[in-house]
Amino acid sequence: MAEIELAAFIGFVLIISLSGVLFPGPLTAATVVRSYSDKWAGAKVSVGHAIVEFPLFLLVAAGSATFFQQNEPLIAVIGIVGGAYLLFFGVKLWRDKDTFDEEKSKSKFTGSAVVIGITLTLFNPAFILWWATIGLVVVTDALTFGTTILLAIWVIHWLVDLGWGIGLSFGIQKAKQYYASQMKKVIRFVCAALILIFGVYFLTSSIWTIAA
């Protein structure tokens, strides 16, 4: 019976993890752009994401979720910084015509994909709130199966992120030979617009939280 419950729980974690990676967000947009000149960009972004996510996961497991839930001003400040960063990132991408020029983008735009994974995760208030709410439920349930299963659940969760990032990057690499000039421009503008929308949302919602 315990084995069935564990299998069902792992299935639940897989579904939750897949729903997260399939939802378009700043990390996805950044991965798409970076993948044009680096087929391992998705993996690197995922590593950066994990550098922030694993310590937060441990904090939630240690009982710190309530701290995040009860400190809206802190989350709001993170949202303001994150929103400003996304606006900067989005405007840079919107204006950078060399984004899909492999030689120029390698030295100019791409920098460190790991760092982008870290910053876009660290300054994403929605990510922190997810772990303080939905993530708390996952962690609490995982603890009923023991510490080993708890750590295994995080590994499974991250492997979903990693698999999605690698798949996205390799897909972009395979498809880029078919990109027409106009299609490259459309992809750049769509990704930039997505990042800008999230930037505005993080910024305005965080300011509203502080003002309320």
Briefly describe each language-model feature range.
Residues 2, 111, 115-134:
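Selected transmembrane alpha-helices and immediately adjacent juxtamembrane segments
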Residues 40-115, 171-179:
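Membrane helix-loop-helix hairpins that form the core translocation module of multi-pass transporters
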Residues 59-61, 122-132, 195-209:
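Hydrophobic alpha-helical transmembrane segments in multi-pass integral membrane proteins
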Residues 3-76, 133-153:
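Juxtamembrane transmembrane-helix termini in multi-pass membrane transport proteins
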